[in-house]
């Protein structure tokens, strides 16, 4: 691992413990854990917001399509509607 033997890793860990102390390392670990937890929570909330936006866009498009076709039918001559239906179906 990183070109270090197990003995060198143990010595490195002991030096780090002596420099920072166990209390600071514990605090750093808990701070890192809280940061990761907050990041995951923010990602889940962002996904919920995106899902809600997509659903609202889908609903808007569906209602716009329904309204558009109704308006088109009201504007066209009923005879033309029958002719077009026979041509395309």
From Swiss-Prot:
Membrane topology value: Single-pass membrane protein
Principal location class: membrane
Keywords: Cell inner membrane, Cell membrane, Membrane, Protein transport, Translocation, Transmembrane, Transmembrane helix, Transport
This protein's name: Sec-independent protein translocase protein TatA
Job of this protein: Part of the twin-arginine translocation (Tat) system that transports large folded proteins containing a characteristic twin-arginine motif in their signal peptide across membranes. TatA could form the protein-conducting channel of the Tat system.
Organism: Haemophilus influenzae (strain ATCC 51907 / DSM 11121 / KW20 / Rd)
Recorded family membership: Belongs to the TatA/E family.
Residues annotated as transmembrane: 1-21
